């Protein structure tokens, strides 16, 4: 077949992206997403991020245990996703046949094969998620939907349980199917189960027949960003995996004392979509935003609470366009007026609100790279011991910190309010260590996207310090898809909050990767003379996120010094617009 045949059939003939390693252990490693994004992937509504560093990790892991390996080191998953059966059959059927031959050879030599699929999980906290078609429910592992469990009870309670214990001893939590259970019919892991015994594809039938005899143990290993970037967590993770799978005499381990009960009968109810919370349900993201003008540092942290919550995160905008980021997934732990997820903690201390973090952060030298997440992650490095200690002291007329949170039926629901105040603290990240003093806001996340009905929106908050008048202000404007305009402004002074009208915000950028050229706002009170707020951008980060109906949300988010007459302060700004990707114009519905 020629290149013309490749274009006509869609089957990839070039195999330069594939690296094959021959080993003597009864183990086959596969890294399906080790490539890099092609430029055209940026035009997609929701481009997939390749699993950076998994090619190198798989290569190192194979050397450590003497395993065979099939490594994708260059092919963009947005071109062909080797982890999706339909795309494999359409564009690389030979790759499926190659895996079947490799498994057959291992089984013929050793009597059984262990298949480990090496993937990347784009959460930064050092974590590993084990996919075998199940999720954990207490002491049970239950199939997701109609998934087949891809490993035996003995393998789950032996090598996999030992892997979990070895990782835990190295401060790396391991979970079963928390994020990626690998139970979908199109998932490559399911090719190594008896799910495809009746398939019309010979390679799938062969793999399923081998699995039906109990001769395949298959596992999907999802490594977080901190476990993939060069550094201590990656070294400790590979060390634990080598210890667990390196004994090739039997390829397993004696069971651990506390065993999991594995349910193998598919529960179709788990395949049904989860019920969404009602539209009237309170927003579920609470956090804090702070700006220290003298240090030129901004910080944003938030926690997801209640139904649909997925995690927590903290981002630091540092001088010279640098960014430090930590993210985590899972359920926020709530104890009174204290929220925590891993090393990130947000709590009430007396009348103050405190944020504390000690852990790894990915630091990126150029904030504009965050327009393409894969580009940002590929340029970043791991700071294994970043520290953040911040305290927000609310202004006298603001609500008591405890009022920001209320507990109801075991869930923590954020009250729809906020508290502005003065900031004090210290950070250490990306070689920078400094004390912080400035301004902050806590409460419902200021920049949450919500239902994304807007075509554009401009928002900001600013503080001016105690003794000033006003103490703080908050301005929001947006244009909806029906071209209706909405605006609100409220100002905090010694008597409390007041609503203003006649609101206008000027906040424009030359391009999605450039900071705002002009930042200002005007507002009036009962038709009186206008107040004008002028901002000078200190730092910013551009973001690109998928929106509804083939649109994409482009956001410029950052911190600025603000002046209001003779008063000086600082705060946060955001400009977002929703573009139709087909026309590159503001979306209309």
Predicted regions and their residues:
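Structured soluble/peripheral alpha/beta segments that form catalytic or ligand/cofactor-binding pockets
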Residues: 258-589
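N-terminal catalytic or cofactor-binding beta/alpha core of small enzyme domains
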Residues: 1-257
């Amino acid at each position: 077949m020629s290149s013309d045949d490749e274009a006509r059939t869609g089957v990839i003939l070039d195999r330069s992206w594939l690296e094959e390693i021959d080993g003597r252990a009864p183990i086959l490693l596969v890294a399906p997403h080790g490539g890099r994004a092609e430029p055209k992937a940026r035009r997609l509504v929701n481009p997939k991020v390749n699993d950076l560093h998994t090619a190198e990790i798989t290569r190192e892991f194979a050397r450590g245990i003497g395993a065979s390996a099939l490594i994708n080191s260059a092919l963009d998953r947005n071109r062909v996703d080797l982890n999706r059966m339909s795309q494999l059959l359409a564009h690389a059927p030979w790759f499926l046949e190659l895996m079947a031959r490799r498994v057959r050879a291992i089984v013929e030599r050793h009597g059984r094969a262990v298949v480990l699929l090496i993937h990347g999980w784009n959460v930064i906290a050092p974590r590993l998620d084990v996919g075998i078609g199940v999720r954990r429910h207490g002491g049970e592992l239950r199939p997701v939907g109609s998934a087949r469990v891809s490993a035996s009870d003995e393998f789950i309670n032996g090598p996999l349980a030992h892997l979990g214990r070895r990782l835990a001893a190295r401060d790396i939590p391991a979970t079963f199917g928390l994020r990626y259970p690998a139970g979908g019919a199109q998932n490559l892991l399911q090719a190594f189960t008896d799910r495809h015994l009746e398939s019309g594809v010979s390679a799938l039938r062969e793999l399923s027949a081998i699995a039906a005899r109990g001769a395949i143990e298959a596992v999907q290993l999802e490594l977080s960003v901190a476990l993939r970037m060069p550094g201590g967590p990656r070294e400790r993770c590979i060390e634990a995996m080598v210890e667990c799978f390196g004994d090739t005499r039997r390829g397993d381990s004696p069971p651990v004392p506390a065993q999991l009960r594995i349910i193998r009968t598919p529960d179709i109810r788990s395949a049904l979509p989860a019920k969404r919370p009602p539209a009237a349900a309170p927003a579920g993201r609470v956090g804090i935003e702070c700006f220290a003008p003298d240090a030129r540092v901004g910080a944003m942290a938030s926690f997801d609470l209640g139904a649909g919550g997925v995690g927590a995160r903290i981002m630091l905008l540092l001088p010279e366009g640098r960014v430090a980021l930590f993210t985590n997934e899972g359920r926020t732990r709530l104890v009174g007026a204290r929220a925590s997820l891993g090393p990130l903690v947000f709590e009430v201390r007396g009348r103050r609100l405190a944020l504390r973090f000690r852990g790894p952060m990915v630091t990126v030298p150029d904030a504009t790279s965050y327009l393409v997440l894969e580009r940002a992650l590929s340029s970043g490095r791991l700071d294994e011991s970043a520290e953040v200690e911040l305290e927000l002291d609310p202004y006298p007329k603001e609500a008591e910190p405890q009022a920001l949170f209320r507990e109801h039926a075991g869930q923590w629901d954020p009250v729809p309010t906020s508290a502005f105040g003065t900031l004090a603290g210290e950070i250490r990240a990306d070689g920078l260590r400094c004390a912080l003093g400035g301004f902050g806001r806590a409460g419902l996340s200021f920049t949450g996207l919500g239902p994304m009905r807007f075509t554009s929106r401009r928002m900001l908050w600013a503080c001016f310090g105690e003794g000033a008048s006003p103490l703080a202000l908050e301005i929001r404007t947006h244009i909806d898809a029906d071209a209706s305009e909405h605006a609100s402004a409220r100002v905090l002074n010694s008597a409390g909050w007041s609503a203003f009208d006649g609101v206008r915000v000027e906040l424009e950028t030359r391009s999605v990767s450039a900071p705002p050229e002009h930042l200002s706002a005007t507002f009036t009170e009962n038709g009186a003379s206008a107040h004008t707020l002028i901002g000078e951008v200190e730092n910013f980060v551009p973001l690109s996120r998928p929106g509804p109906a083939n649109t994409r949300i482009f956001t410029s988010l950052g911190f600025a010094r603000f002046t209001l007459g003779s008063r000086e302060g600082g705060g946060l700004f955001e400009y977002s617009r929703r573009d139709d990707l087909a026309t590159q114009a503001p979306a209309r519905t």
